[in-house]
Amino acid sequence: MKYDNLLDRFIKYVKVNTRSDPDSETTPSTESQEAFALTILKPEMEAIGLQDVHYNPVNGYLIGTLPANNPTLTRKIGFIAHMDTADFNAENVNPQIIDNYQGGDITLGSSNYKLDPKAFPNLNNYIGQTLITTDGTTLLGADDKSGIAEIMTAIEFLTSQPQIEHCDIKVAFGPDEEIGVGADKFEVADFEVDFAYTMDGGPLGELQYETFSAAALEVTFLGRNVHPGTAKDQMINALQLAIDFHEKLPAKERPEYTDGYQGFYHLTGLTGTVEEARASYIIRDFEEASFEARKVKVENIAQSMNAQLGTKRVLVELNDQYYNMKKVIEKDMTAIELAKEVMEELTIKPVIEPIRGGTDGSKISFMGIPTPNIFAGGENMHGRFEFVSLQTMERAVDVIIGLVCKA
């Protein structure tokens, strides 16, 4: 179905810079996210008929309710999307609208960048559709403002069509998903639902209830700096220790060599001097045993290097971030079966594959609310080549409406 306000709403949202900050210690991590919630989303939620709209400054979540208009629809369903965007320029987002895309290259504004089907064959799935792209200088922010726009549009449709019967609906827009802490302070008591969905997936049909299990690894290397002219048998180069550590990890177990259910070690940062260096990694895997084995491996590498050095110069700090929500959702597949049924009725083929990443739903599921993930439409997310199809967004709205009417 076409929805008159969906495109304009999405464009309005993406023009607001809500980039999160991994180095911040506040919640939300950036003031712009709170401003977006309070000055744009909250008034709009109230205007379209959501009730009890309130912002929690402790956890950064904006929540609203649409009560059921049919008492026989007894389920309570939640929909969640995140306000922040990824670690890429989000200032002065200037979306391009490509009507009736007919294939071929899309020049991104006046930049030297283009969307080329040879580099991005997923473009070929969108012939004849309306695409929203960047101008080549920023990301787009479809991750996850497409999800916000879809939820808002579905609520607006339901409140404007009171004859359409639906169950109790909760809506939550949260911060800092992109930096992995968005759901850390989520309050289940403020979101009383039987299950929920994050609208944070990619192409049409995605329905996901398996995520990575994730850990952050920080390794500090302590060197000993002396003049290089007299360094023999004295200098210990911390940067070289970092290189040695990295080379002991399996070379083929990096993101660029893995897919499907394969896990990886990913070096995300390396800084330092001869005296001291620091390497940042993320560790990802799907199965609990292999996830734990990866953590044991890095500990063993550090121990081996320290034994060889004769002193403790490789210091490992490991912190689990989130776990594969499959463990929770498999206990009750109601949310998945309902979504599959609705999609199939809408002639959308459910694409059930693992998320090679995480969502806020990962943590929220372990808090007691099963929260799988549904497509929101974004492609090539987190950079200047990001785009989204208006038609896919419309279909996501259809799914939301179908879910609450069938509950």
Curated annotation (Swiss-Prot):
Binds 2 Zn(2+) ions per subunit. SUPFAM superfamilies: Bacterial exopeptidase dimerisation domain, Zn-dependent exopeptidases. It is found in: Cytoplasm. Its cofactor is Zn(2+). It catalyses: Release of the N-terminal residue from a tripeptide. Zn(2+) 1 binds at residues 82, 143, 200. One of its GO terms (molecular function) is zinc ion binding. It is an enzyme of class 3 (hydrolase). Belongs to the peptidase M20B family. HAMAP family: Aminopeptidase_M20. This is Peptidase T. It comes from Streptococcus pyogenes serotype M5 (strain Manfredo).
